[in-house]
């Protein structure tokens, strides 16, 4: 539940949404934050290329 919320929040709301979702869930918040940052990195890379 926490992972799904952090994942959806990060993808929809951006960096702040992903951080708030992962921290609010509290279940593996660090892992969720890393996954969100990795996804954002892929999105930025895809937009450039």
From Swiss-Prot:
Which membrane topology describes this protein?
Single-pass membrane protein
Q: Please give the biological process terms from Gene Ontology that the record holds.
A: sporulation resulting in formation of a cellular spore
Q: Does the entry annotate any disulfide bonds, and if so which pairs? A: none
Which is one Gene Ontology cellular component term of this protein? membrane
Compartments where found: Membrane
Q: Per the similarity annotation, which family is this?
A: Belongs to the SscA family.
Q: What is this protein called?
A: Sporulation protein YjcZ
Write down the species: Bacillus subtilis (strain 168)
